[in-house]
Amino acid sequence: MPEPQDAPSLRLTLAPDRHAVSRGETISVAVALTGARDVTSVPFHLQFDPGVLQYVGTRTGPALNGRSLQPIFLASVNPDRPGDLAVGLSFVRSSGTFNGSGAILLIDFLALGRGRSDLHFDRATVRGATSEPLTAEVVGSTAEVR
């Protein structure tokens, strides 16, 4: 029987590098894991206001730099749902699993129009060594364009 997960310690968080930006500036939103053990994938949707922010691109975060892990990720916005960014991040099985804490992805947005955009996860899961969903606290954020 597997050991029970330490549920409260695992957290998936959205953390913008700044909470307020001017129109035309880029804001980077870190997707961070805290207290991860044997994580193999992190699929999620990120909801945002497309009138305030425009998705620009996604890159691996500093928590993955200097590790032997081989991340594979896809990120795209469906033109029919402009405020819905679908992201899939997984690690090549032979390269190991993610353990620890830190920003695993950085998602860049262009500040388009004045206003406030909630940034929240939808259908987010953190998956363990056998692709089982792990119990995790999921925390969103906001961004303001002035």
Q: Predicted regions: what is each one?
A:
Residues 1-146:
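Acidic, low-complexity intrinsically disordered segments
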